Swiss-Prot record:
The keyword Transmembrane applies. This is UPF0283 membrane protein YcjF. It is a multi-pass membrane protein. InterPro entries: DUF697, UPF0283. GO terms for cellular component: plasma membrane. HAMAP family: UPF0283.
Amino acid sequence: MTEPLKPRIDFDGPLEVDQNPKFRAQQTFDENQAQNFAPATLDEAPEEEGQVEAVMDAALRPKRSLWRKMVMGGLALFGASVVGQGVQWTMNAWQTQDWVALGGCAAGALIIGAGVGSVVTEWRRLWRLRQRAHERDEARDLLHSHGTGKGRAFCEKLAQQAGIDQSHPALQRWYASIHETQNDREVVSLYAHLVQPVLDAQARREICRSAAESTLMIAVSPLALVDMAFIAWRNLRLINRIATLYGIELGYYSRLRLFKLVLLNIAFAGASELVREVGMDWMSQDLAARLSTRAAQGIGAGLLTARLGIKAMELCRPLPWIDDDKPRLGDFRRQLIGQVKETLQKGKTPSEK
């Protein structure tokens, strides 16, 4: 049997017309533009840094302002006046044979000499910290360079600054992997993948250790003053150790720039301590809730310490981050939570027995 024909269907709207896609006009690049071409990354989510990250940048990065130049000029003029007055006093004491005043002038000269030596030493350390930023820019240029001859000397200088011996296995592997036909980009990339991770691993261990100690100390300490002093000491020590690992010796002025961030960390610990004490007394929570609050407070302080260590590691490191090898705060967070849980479980086990 044949199926009956379906009735006709009339549509009111017009038929859709195929729309041809519109393309932009062709653009031709010359040879120089083609070599420097880099694809743009669209909708790239920026890493969440927060206000603490901005404070770190402001603390670790050297600042120059008109007021600072005026203060430095005034100090230099005052120092010159002190030296001139000291010379005049010395001449008068010698002419009048005032030996007591002459001894005082000699003691003052020794003190001034020690002060000048300290200023020169601090300036040299500050200059070394600024040179590290220039070395990082140079490494970034070499990672995009197709020339030859500069990469090996640059990497050998970095290894010498970091105190890596020529017989180190990582450095020997790097020497065995490079040859004369490789350009600067390949040589520096090999150094970044073979030698630099040795120092990065040591810095990560220092960050983990300091963050864990800060977390556990705050989680078990009942005194806010002890927490604040402990965090200050641990953070300053962490910065010094990371800088030493990368071949940088921090001076007094460099520590002053970092002290603002340390104060932020201390303020966090002290404020959270006050909130915990007032909240617990007001709400009359049990011991378990008190331990949970202390653990959360300790983890927060430990994460701030880890964030400080990551930023110090980034600014003391001679090479830029490549291939997403930058340490993430989430890695330290998981480790800190695991350590706090383990510590609390060990503390509950004897009490239950």
